[in-house]
């Protein structure tokens, strides 16, 4: 529980400070990337765990999602993370402007192909928390 909470908190903090399509790096100026994310934007934190012995296979089919999702103009933020202590335990952090954009993303063929492979590779499917981005009062 505590590890999951730490992972989710790390995902949120990391995503909040990085808004480029490349690797992880600090923002160029204070708050520049935040202007792209509106109050109430549709945020998702998802979790998937590999079946024992399937960690490398799940990682191999999941890594290509980074470039594909970040290439979607409707995607505002996408981070894939793996638990350092439990290889094969992945946390996804995604932000879209609204639920319709997220559902359109889920309908993409590459996402559907990924979901179709999960029964052989993942324990219990994907656990998803659907959230909204909050901004300070006045924003």
Language model: regions and residue ranges:
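Short amphipathic alpha-helical segments
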Residues: 54-76, 110-113
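Sec/Tat-exported extracytoplasmic proteins
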Residues: 52, 66-73, 106, 118, ...
């Amino acid at each position: 529980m505590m590890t999951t909470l730490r992972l989710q908190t790390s995902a949120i903090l990391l995503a909040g400070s990085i808004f480029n399509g490349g690797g992880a790096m600090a923002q160029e100026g204070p708050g520049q990337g935040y202007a792209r994310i509106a109050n109430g934007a549709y945020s998702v934190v998802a979790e998937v765990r590999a079946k024992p012995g399937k960690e490398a296979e799940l990682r191999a089919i999941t890594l290509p999602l980074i470039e594909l999702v970040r290439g979607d103009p409707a995607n505002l933020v996408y981070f894939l993370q793996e638990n350092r202590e439990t290889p094969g335990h992945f946390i996804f952090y995604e932000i879209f402007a609204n639920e319709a954009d997220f559902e359109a993303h889920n309908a993409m063929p590459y996402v559907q192909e990924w979901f179709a492979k999960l029964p052989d590779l993942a324990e219990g499917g994907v656990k998803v928390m659907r959230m909204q981005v909050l901004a300070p009062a006045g924003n």
